[in-house]
Amino acid sequence: MKKIFTAFIMMLCAACVASAANYLTFTAEEDGSTFGIVNKNNNPDVQYSLDGGETWTALAGGKMVTLAHKGDKALLRGDNPEGFSKDTKKYSSFTMTGMIAASGSVMSLIDGVGETLVIPANYCFYNLFVGCKSLTKAPTLPATTLSKRCYAF
């Protein structure tokens, strides 16, 4: 009984952490929408969850993730304390098909939860959504301390 109670408490704590975080979130606005990441001489840590933050999978460059049904969501996070992209020759961009609305904070790609308000490096989110014609809504850009060309495209 004690093991069951402990497991329940651990699951409850994990759910609280997932709901408290402000993850970058992609929501399908039509069936079969997809997203992926293209890395140009760059390899940031990016993970996604399709089950509300219970399990996380690394988002590898060139891999497309399908949001099968309208309303399906993907949470995104990363551990990139020195910045997501580096400069005009070393950066990563999302790629999308279908129709996808973004919400939450891009800062979850930096600190894993979307709490930091400081852009850690120049060019941090350079070209992040360049060419994403499928993006119907932009995410929150909450940083209050910016750096050179941090949101440039």
Task: Show the residue positions of the predicted features.
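Sec-dependent, cleavable N-terminal signal peptides
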Residues: 1-21
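Boundary/junction segments of secreted and surface-exposed precursor proteins
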Residues: 18-40
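Structural signature of tandem-repeat unit edges
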Residues: 26, 61-66, 74, 86-122, ...
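Noncatalytic modules at the cell exterior or secretory-pathway interfaces
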Residues: 33-35, 65-82
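Structural motif
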Residues: 37-42, 77-80, 113
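Conserved Ser/Thr-centered positions that define the repeating blades of beta-propeller domains
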Residues: 47-50
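Short beta-strand segments within Ig-like beta-sandwich modules, predominantly Fibronectin type-III
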Residues: 56-60
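Intrinsic low-complexity tandem-repeat regions in disordered proteins
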Residues: 125, 151-153
